């Protein structure tokens, strides 16, 4: 059984603050998103019937209407859970995958999210816990509880060292996370997906993950919402200035995707 700690109670309160801050322009990366700079070539002679275009695909043994996933963002509070219920319902209607935000708080506080599976029976649902939490004493127990509660098709392990180091209550001991991921891959009853939260996953890190059996990676590069900026807004101004160089820190998707082709046949 996972019992709530003071950290879990603080985490619940923090999640609502995150929701409020994420609606502010101050939470956005101060960069031009690299995908906005890409122009796709126009084909004036397609030589095909558009009615033959089929965007459907299979992901985690379930069919999607097109390759798209609403990735994990929030949860663990009544407001966060209402958002997840809305996301799950829309994802099921559209036939796309859906992932929840970190489940640590909801599990520790005995707040089940089973309703999500009832709303979204047809699509892949991805659970979520942090890499640091996985490496702690009850990490595997937490992971199993997260999977069971959602009847999850996969479990995302999020890697967020930049966010944690800026977060006032953040945890900084990342020792043993890779080993814990390897154990999770070998022992948990569903696939493991590794995701960043906005700073990206480099090729060397992706290779380490692949070497321990990970086949699903969400690189989650810089652009859009910045968790570094959200956490910095919660700090006193004097401390915020200390982290100024890291507020737009992160790999660009246009740099990372070509690199990932080196191991694309394996993941």
PLM feature spans:
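An N-cap/entry alpha-helix motif that binds or orients negatively charged groups
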Residues: 1-60, 64
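A gly/proline- and charged-residue-enriched helix-loop-helix capping module
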Residues: 93-131
């Amino acid at each position: 059984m996972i019992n709530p700690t003071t950290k879990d109670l603080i985490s619940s309160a923090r999640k609502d603050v995150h929701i409020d801050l994420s609606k502010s322009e101050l939470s956005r990366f101060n960069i031009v998103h690299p995908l906005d700079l890409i122009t796709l070539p126009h084909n004036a002679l397609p030589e095909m019937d558009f009615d033959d275009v089929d965007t459907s695909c299979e992901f985690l043994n379930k069919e999607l209407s097109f390759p798209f996933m609403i990735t994990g963002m929030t949860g663990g509070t009544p407001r966060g859970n209402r958002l997840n219920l809305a996301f799950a319902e829309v994802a099921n209607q559209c036939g796309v995958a859906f992932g929840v935000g970190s489940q640590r708080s909801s599990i520790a506080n005995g707040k089940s999210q089973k309703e999500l599976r009832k709303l979204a029976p047809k699509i892949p649902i991805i659970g979520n816990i942090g890499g640091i939490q996985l490496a702690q004493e009850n990490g595997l127990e937490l992971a199993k509880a997260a999977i069971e509660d959602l009847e999850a098709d996969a479990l995302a392990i999020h890697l967020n060292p930049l966010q944690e180091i800026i977060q006032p209550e953040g945890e900084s001991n990342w020792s043993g996370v890779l080993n814990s991921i390897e154990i999770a891959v070998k022992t948990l009853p569903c696939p493991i997906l590794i995701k960043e939260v906005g700073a990206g996953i480099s090729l060397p890190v992706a290779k380490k993950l692949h070497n321990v059996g990970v086949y699903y990676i969400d690189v989650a590069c810089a652009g859009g919402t910045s968790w570094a900026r959200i956490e910095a807004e919660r700090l006193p101004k004097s401390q915020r200035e200390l982290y100024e160089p890291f507020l737009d820190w992160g790999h660009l998707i246009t740099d990372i995707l070509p690199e990932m082709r080196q191991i694309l046949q394996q993941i």
